[in-house]
Amino acid sequence: MTKQIKKQPLLSGLLILFLAAMIFANIGGNMYQSFMPLYIKDLGASIRQIGLFFTLAQIVPLFLQILGGWISDSLGRLRAIAIGSVFGVIGFIPMVIADRWEWLLVAVAIGSIARALVGPSFDAFIAEHSSEENRGKVFGISQAIFMIVSVVGPPLGGWMAGSYGFRLMLLVAGIFYFIAMVMRLGMAREAAKGGASAPQKLSIDSLKINLRTMFGMIASGGLVTWILLTDGLRDVSFQFSENLLPVYMQEIGGLSLQQIGWVTSVFGICMMLTTIPGGWLSDKVGERVGIAIGMIFMSCALLLFINIPRDIPWLYFIGWGLAGVGIGLLTPAYQSLISKAVPAHMRGTAFGLFSTSLGVISLPSPWLGAQLWDRVNPQFPFMLTAIVLLLSVIPIWIKFKLPATDRKENAPSKESAVVTTV
C-alpha cells in the first residue's frame, strides 16, 4: 500500500483542471488589479479618496469570508467555487459601466462574494489533494503553475488600458473570468454526478461548532494564535502601502501603464520560479524558514522602491523581482503551516476566519496609508511597511513551530493520502 501511495503523482488530473480554471479566472483578475488604484484615480478620486475606497472595500468581505469557508466545508470545494464564480462574472458589469469611482464599490461588494467562496476553497482543495509530507511541495508547484496569471495578466492589462482604455480592458478581463466560470460549473456538475462529494446540510449549529472550535484554537496561545497575530501585523503594514504602489510608480517613478504592467509581470515570473523551491524548503527544514526569509526579501524590495531615482526606472524591475522571490518562498510555507495546524474538516472555515480576522485588524489601514502619504511624504507608508516586515521575523522564527503531536494528529491515513476528487 505504501508503494502505491508513493507512486501517486503530485498533481492529479482533477487538480490540473482545477488550476487551469483558476488561471483563466485570475488572468482576468490580474489584468485590472494592479491598475485598480489608477482606474479609481481616472474616475476622479484623490489620493485620500483612493485610501478611503480600499478601506470601504474591505467591509463587505469581513461578513462573508467565514461564511464562505463554512459553505466550502459543508457543500464541498467545487460547488462553493462554482457558486462564487457566478457572482464573480456579475461583479464585472458595474466595473465596466461605472462613470464615478463610488460605483466601483458595488462591483467590489459583488466580487467579494466570489472571493469569499473561492479563496478558502482554493487552499483547502489543494491541501486535501496532497499528503502531509509533500504538502509544501504540492502548494509550491500549484502556486508556480498558478503564477502564470501574474506573468500574463498585468502586461496584457497595461497594454490594453494604455492603448484602448480601462473599460475595454475590463471587458476582456470579464471574458476570461466567464470562461473560468463555465469550466468550474462543469467540474461541480461532474463531481455531483459521480457522487465524489456528499454535501452536508447548511445549518447554524454546524457553523457555531466550527467557529467555537476555531476560536478555542486562537485563544489557546498556541501556533494558530501566533499565525494570526504575525499575519495580522503583516497585513496591517501591507495595507498602508499596497494599494498606493501603482500610483507611486506612476507619479513618483514616472512609469507608464505599460511599464507598470511589465514590472508587475517580473514579480510573477520571480514568484513562479521560487514557489517550488519554497515548497521544498518548507517540507525539508520547516515552514518558518521560508516565511522568515520571504519577509526579509519583501522588506528589502520596499526599501529599494522608495530610494529609486526617477531617472533609473529599471530598478523597479529589481525591486519587483525581490518581492516576487519573497512571496514565492513564504506562500507555500504559510499555506502548508495553516493546513497542518487545523483539523482537515475545518480548513475552509479556518482560511475564511484568518481572512476575516486580518480584514478586521487592517480595516482602516488603506485610509491611514493615504493620510501618511499626504501629511508626511509618499515614501513614509512604504518605509513603515518595510520596518514591520523585518520586525515580524522575530516572532515567526521563535513561534512558528508545529508540535510533533499536531503533526501526528493531522497526518492523513494511507487511504486519504491517495488523490481523490471532491
List PLM regions with ranges.
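Juxtamembrane intracellular "pre-TM" segments in multi-pass secondary transporters
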Residues: 1-12, 190-226, 414-422
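Cytoplasmic helix-loop-helix junction between adjacent transmembrane helices
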Residues: 108-146
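Cytoplasmic membrane-interface "Motif A"-like loop-to-helix N-cap segments
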Residues: 74-85, 284-295
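Short amphipathic helix-loop junctions that connect adjacent transmembrane helices
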Residues: 35-48, 243-258
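C-terminal membrane-cytosol helix-exit motif in multi-pass small-molecule transporters
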Residues: 175-196, 392-400
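Residue-level signature of mid-helix packing/kink "hotspots" within the transmembrane helices
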Residues: 58-66, 150-151, 268-276, 362-363
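C-terminal ends and interior cores of transmembrane alpha-helices
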Residues: 86-99, 297-310
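Helix-to-loop junctions at the C-terminal end of transmembrane segments
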Residues: 64-76, 161, 275-286, 373
